[in-house]
Swiss-Prot record:
The protein's role, per its UniProt record: Diterpene cyclase involved in the biosynthesis of labdane-related diterpenoids (LRDs) natural products. Catalyzes the cyclization of ent-CDP into ent-trachylobane as a major and ent-kaurene as a minor product.
Transit peptide, residues from-to: 1-37
Name of protein: Ent-trachylobane synthase KSL2, chloroplastic
Organism: Ricinus communis
Co-factor requirement: Mg(2+)
Enzyme class: lyase
PANTHER family reported for this sequence: ENT-COPALYL DIPHOSPHATE SYNTHASE, CHLOROPLASTIC (PTHR31739), TERPENE SYNTHASE METAL-BINDING DOMAIN-CONTAINING PROTEIN (PTHR31739:SF34)
Gene: KSL2
Main location: plastid
Positions with a binding annotation for Mg(2+) 1: 529, 533
Amino acid sequence: MLLTCTNSLKISSQAKEWESKTLTGMSLEQLNKRIRIPASDIEGTMTSRVKEMLSKVELSVSSYDTAWVAMVPTLDSSKQPLFPKSLKWIMENQQPDGSWGLDLSHPLLIKDSLSSTLACVLALQKWNVGQQLVHKGLDFVQSNIWAATDEHQRSPIGFDMIFPSMIEYGRDMGLNLSLNQSLVEAMLLKRDLETKRLFYYLKDKPSNLAYVAEGLNTLNDWKEVMKFQRSNGSLFNSPSSTAAALIHLHDGKCFEYLNSLTKKFGNAVPTIYPFDIYARLFVIDSLEKLGIDRYVREDKEKMLDDIYRCWMQGSEEIFSDPTCCAMAFRILRTNGYAISSDALANFDEKESLFYEKDAKSTLELFKASQTTIFQDEPVLDKINAWTSTYLEKELRDGTIPDKSLHAEVDYALKHIQANLVRLEHRSYIENYNVDNVSLLKASYRFCNVDNRDLLTFSFQDYNMCQSMHRKELDYLEGWIKKCGIDQLEYARQTIKYAAFSIASSIFQPKFSDGRISWAQNSVLTTIVDDFFDYGGSMEELVNLIELVQRWDDHTTIGYKSKEVEILFNAVYSTTNDLADKARILQGRCVKKHMIDSWIFLLKAMLKEAEWARNKIVPTMDDFIPNGYISFALGPIILTSLYLVEPLSEEAVNSEEYEKLYMVISILGRLINDRVATQSDGAQGKLNIVTLEVINGKGAITEEEVQEKVARTIDSNRRELLRMVSQTEGSIVPKACKDFFWTMSNVLHLFYMGDDGYSSPTKMMSAVNAVINEPIVLP
């Protein structure tokens, strides 16, 4: 049933361990021996490097923030710098072209270089030192001032307010700034208009303005700014903001904060501190998006436990920053930690961001809004509304200059419900930003996070897993011929889609048996569904059910047709093979469970066939309990779970297990029936939409039913994600629960036309991306 709406559809692996010979006719046991993953560097040196990245993340220094620290005078005199070693660092770190900054070669970071360079020039001019350096710095600013108004340049937070103000500071100091006067006036006008606008719109959120206080030339009450001083003495963990406050107020706690930074980092300071939580979230998020986090599972879990403790303690580092808060919320919730979305209430409006055009923060908030697990989470609903609108506009207008971020936003918006992680991994790998440069008020990077290593690691791992998927598909194509189901006239060629549907999310090598089971039963249930719809007579349908009920004693019954014989033997031999394999993993025989799932399915399909052929209109109370079983996810999902991880009888008989199956089955039935209303009607089949209209007797229209079904789909999807994510009180293994969530994403992919794969061409491209085409990096 899973594949009923799909359209009909050479690998040259670089790994020498893989052969390209066909596996047609091989047994499942032989296949598993052939595709065993060899020990390699993937589990050796690279894993050690990733663990090192997780254990300690180092941040680059910021010329911009160091310059502001260098401008702070001693507390008893305005003629001497309080941090002379920071001033010395500036004098020793000018680049040959006269600039200061992190990434001088990046063509889109010229605004950042302008800001850092002018700040350093101001520091030198203030203390009347390094005049030659000042002249070289001014030459750089004058030569590159065009970038200050270039909308295609990546802009540091608050640049349009801070940079013009620094020009004014420079003039007041007597700097000879030979800049285009009309351009400077335009920047000053834009700053003033932006300041007025923000004062008006952010009167209830003054912290956003205080973050860029060094750029507010009209700010008279610095004591108001100090309301946002944190327990560590800083303003927003920003050395530049804290230094600006210390210049005006001589606050002791500000001094202690900056003094500790210069001691810790050796005279030059980073653009944000502390940054431990965000840095670790950044690395975890990168590993997840690259598909390699499984190699450091224990380290990741330990780190998430630490982050969760910080969350529960109300860490300022988390809750004061939208990017950090959104990322922490999403990663913690999807990894099973019980946290409330109310923590994101401060970011439920666009104006809550420090910087209006902060696409990175907006994307993180949008992703967080996708993790709704309760029926009433208004904060996430509000965040989803404004972030999706904003990001869609940014894409249309082409105003996201960072190529990697642009690709990530584009993927996130196009695959809201059909987010198949392997496609996300591939997109992220192919668009990965190896420069590892991010922007706050200045650019920064994590010095010991080697993005090139991560990229190499991830693309090798992707291609290795893909090689296994290709071998699995070879085996499945041989199985089709061996079973003879390719001889059935009405049997659609769905094996590629079946293999893709599971490999696109459950890709890990150790789950190969589970993937093969999923694909085999997806094909079998689709063919059986067609047989019950129009391929077989009632006598043949009853015959097939009796054969399955007898199982090993089926020879006493006989076959009513060749089609029945082929179908039964395919179900019989495949289920027996899978049960033998499952027995090894489970330590007990689970064949009866597998057979029962087929019996329940066939009886439900027979009931629907009787309704259709006898033109009976059932009540909704009769249709739904039967309809969720007839959607055929029992053999597909439940059988596969026995080949994933040990699954106790307690878990199989639990309310949690039954509810997972029921919720995903109802979800599938709703998604299918919402889309297939017209096609089902043409075939004389009833579904939830048409039944609701018929039983409503004119009181409800089809459009109203469609809207009702859409709301129910959303409700069930939230409930499913809650059950899959929760860990407290759960006895079903997480790896098994992931199969239910994978099915939800696959159903949206196959049945919904608004997630990017509605055309055969796009679907084929997705199949090839996961199974056939290795990643080739430039």
